[in-house]
Design a protein with these regions (language model features):
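Residues marking helix boundaries in flexible regions
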Residues: 5-8, 80, 196, 514
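Feature marking well-ordered beta-strand scaffolds used for ligand recognition
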Residues: 217, 221-224, 264-271, 281-705
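Intrinsically disordered, low-complexity segments enriched in glycine/proline and serine/threonine
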Residues: 5-6, 159, 207, 464, ...
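Generic N-terminal simple sequence motifs
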Residues: 16-17, 31, 79, 467, ...
Length: 705
């Protein structure tokens, strides 16, 4: 066993606001005080743009100050708090700035061996008066017999978009055109009307001209007559005039109806043998696409100008179900397991296979495994460092250099440790790198002689390890948005994909080789490579991004669909609902499929979400998603074809498995952290019980009683 240090202390708080549930330590509490008067604050009132200072102390039940560091966070994109970490005396003088209105929170959190201590100060920020309304891409020429939707943006005097306002739409001449309650304007007759959007005491108006409708019929066809659940159908509809001329400016609406069937029913003469109580469920879009969630006979309808046309489609079960069979399991019962990595041996160990797993809220250990015989995997070496948590572990492409992250070091030097893993039976420490990383390194990645390391949840630093014994920083990437925070970074083909909570995914050129669109291989084209070529590890250049409206962006993985000419980034959530009166939290969230085929206009088209559990990390191989789902175990999902709607409801889940172990740190409960497909098997790390290897096998035929 190799050691750097052995003294253990409180866990660094870099990633605490997104960690697994643990017990509350009620022996300690946070006190929020006025920095000059030193009286206790029950709340704080600020206007947008204003700042105030708050003194935060961590004390025991007798009011004595506890000398340890803790983390401070403002509500994302609403409150900025600086600094984000206290000093070692257990005190922080924090400058708080309000960016949004509402009943907000300034939060503090510390983690110790007895559990976590949390505290919050209410920050009340009043609403700013509204200033203006603007129509979004308004249509001013409309046609009788059609319906047009209007939307607006509402701005306040702080120049911010105000959401969740009650905007009322009215028409000055309802005989010409009339609004419903949802911003849809129905055109009744030719003429002019002034439409007005009103909220509170401000409004905006627009003159709309209603013209005679030249439409005389609608032509409608669909791309397929029989599909599986989850397959996207293209709806081809055109409006024609009396001379069969196509009218491009006449709106078309699409709808569906249908009858669901049992998964095992047979179709007879295009009718199911028995209907069920389930609805014929699916998703239809107004740009002409449909996908079904349940098998059945569906009627798809295109309507415009009083004309309609329909087509029927048969939807059959997707039938991708398999099962996961255990190949091997290495139990870790004394500490919690964090992430994993697997790789092929090199040199004298060529032909063998190895894995490394980290540890969470433990003693700073990383375990190295021989998995050459997956059924008999075993720990062959251990590295121990000064840390409570070794959250992340990575191995270089050539299988010779490893890196492990550190959080909770006793000397507050929470950097990273560089390892020689050429001989996994005798792993040695090459060096450690702590420069400006003392706030804790939560996640790391190795790509082409560089380590990408998260620094205190603020940015990722890029560290050259061409000589692993002498690492040095060459660059960094940090967002400039207020209160920004980062959780993870992944690098592939010289493009870095970082996950930044509410700021979403950022795509950065760190050495991508520029690729010509003309020379691209069909179905294997990353459009960001067409933009790359100017960035490097020392000069990272942003290529694109997409915000996360829910603020839960925890991980990201690029996905070049093998079955379509589309490029997605699959972003993963991590968030949890508090249970009133309990230290436990209910994890929620899933994986969002963002179509970046047009890098300037990314669109989320699909989601995979298991209703009762929450997501963690994921991996893609081919057209298959492998997902770690905390208490939901490991999930394997078919992501072939165009992706749209609710993938879970569409029957795309191939298999799931819960690795329950009576000898785990929490007996008989799974808590899957990370997952990697490798050489026909699927390896995953379970927080509660160690390392697993499973494989997909066909479902056994059902017998009879």
């Amino acid at each position: 066993m190799k050691k750097i240090y052995s003294i253990l202390f409180l866990l660094s708080l870099t990633g605490l606001f997104g960690q697994p549930p643990r017990s509350l330590n009620t022996d300690l509490e946070f006190v929020f005080e006025h920095p000059l008067l030193l009286h206790r604050l029950d709340s704080l009132s600020l206007n947008i743009g204003e700042e105030a200072s708050v003194l935060i102390r961590l004390v025991d039940s007798k009011g004595n100050q506890v000398k340890t560091t803790f983390m401070i966070r403002g509500q994302r994109k609403a409150i900025v708090a600086e600094p984000r970490r206290s000093d070692t005396t257990g005190v922080a003088k924090v400058t708080v700035k309000a960016l949004d209105s509402g009943e907000l929170n300034l939060r503090a959190m510390a983690i110790g061996k007895k559990g976590r201590t949390v505290g919050a100060l209410k920050v009340n920020v009043p609403l700013v008066p509204l200033e203006k309304i603007t129509f979004v891409a308004p249509i001013q020429k409309v046609f009788v017999g059609t319906s047009v939707n209007y939307s607006v943006k509402v701005f306040d005097k702080a120049k911010r978009i105000r959401r969740n306002t009650n905007v009322v739409f009215t028409s000055s001449n309802n005989k010409v055109a009339e609004f419903d309650n949802f911003g849809n304007l129905t055109i009744n007759k030719t003429g002019k009307t002034t439409i007005t959007a009103t909220v509170d005491d401000i409004d905006e108006s627009l003159v709309v001209s209603a013209k005679k409708n030249p439409a005389r019929k609608i032509k409608f066809d669909i791309s397929e007559n029989q599909v599986r659940t989850g397959d996207v159908i293209k709806l081809n509809a055109t409006v024609l005039d009396g001379r069969d001329k196509v009218l491009d400016n006449i709106p078309i609406t699409f709808s569906y109806s249908g009858q669901a069937i049992h998964q095992t029913d047979n179709f007879i003469n295009n009718r199911s043998t028995e209907s069920v109580g389930l609805p014929a469920s699916g998703l239809i879009t107004q740009n002409g696409k449909f996908v079904a969630e349940t098998p059945g006979i569906y009627t798809l309808t295109a309507q415009s100008s009083g004309f309609s046309a329909s087509k029927k489609v048969k939807v059959v079960p997707r039938n991708v179900r398999k099962r996961l069979e255990v190949v091997g399991h290495g139990t870790i019962s004394n500490v919690n397991t964090s992430d994993l990595w697997v790789w092929p041996g090199v040199g004298k160990h060529k032909g063998k296979d190895f894995a490394v797993t980290g540890t969470h809220s433990a003693d700073g250990e990383a375990y190295f495994w021989d998995i050459s015989d997956p059924a008999n995997m075993e720990i062959i070496d251990t590295i121990k460092v000064d840390a409570r948590t070794v959250n992340d572990v990575k191995i270089s492409e050539d299988g010779r250099v490893g890196v492990i992250s550190r959080e909770g070091a006793s000397n507050r030097k929470n950097g990273l440790v560089i390892l020689d893993v050429t001989d996994p039976f005798n792993v040695s420490i090459i060096n450690e790198y702590n420069d400006d990383l003392t706030g804790g390194v939560h996640n790391v990645f190795i790509y082409e002689d560089h380590i990408y390391a998260l620094s205190a949840g603020r940015r990722y630093d890029i560290i050259n390890i061409s000589d692993p014994a002498n690492p040095f920083r060459v660059g960094s990437y940090e967002l400039n948005s207020p209160g920004h925070s980062i959780h993870d970074v992944w690098v592939e083909n010289g493009i870095a994909y970082s996950s930044n909570w509410s700021d979403g995914v950022h795509v950065v050129d760190v050495g991508g080789i520029k690729q010509s669109e003309k020379s691209r291989a069909k179905n294997q084209f990353n459009p960001f490579l067409a933009l790359a070529g100017k960035g490097s590890p020392g000069n990272p250049i942003k290529l694109g991004s997409k915000e996360d409206p829910n603020g839960h962006n925890h991980a990201a993985f690029p996905f070049q669909s093998e079955s379509t000419n589309k490029f997605y980034i699959i972003t993963g959530d991590e968030w949890a609902k508090a249970v009133p009166g309990s230290p436990e939290r209910i994890f929620q969230g899933g994986f969002h499929f963002v179509d970046f085929t047009d890098v300037k206009n990314p669109v989320e088209t699909a989601i995979y979400q298991v209703p009762e559990v929450g997501s963690h990390n994921h991996w893609v191989k081919g057209d298959t998603l492998f997902a770690g789902y905390y208490y939901g175990g490991i999930r394997v999902v078919d992501i072939s074809g165009e992706l749209m709607g609710n993938l879970y409801a569409q029957g795309r889940e191939i298999a799931f498995f819960k690795g329950e172990d009576p000898n785990g740190t929490t007996p008989n409960i799974t808590n899957v952290w990370g997952v990697i497909p490798y050489k026909g098997l699927i390896y995953f790390a379970d927080l509660n019980n160690g390392l697993w290897a499973v494989r997909l096998v066909d479902n056994a035929p059902l017998g009879t009683n």
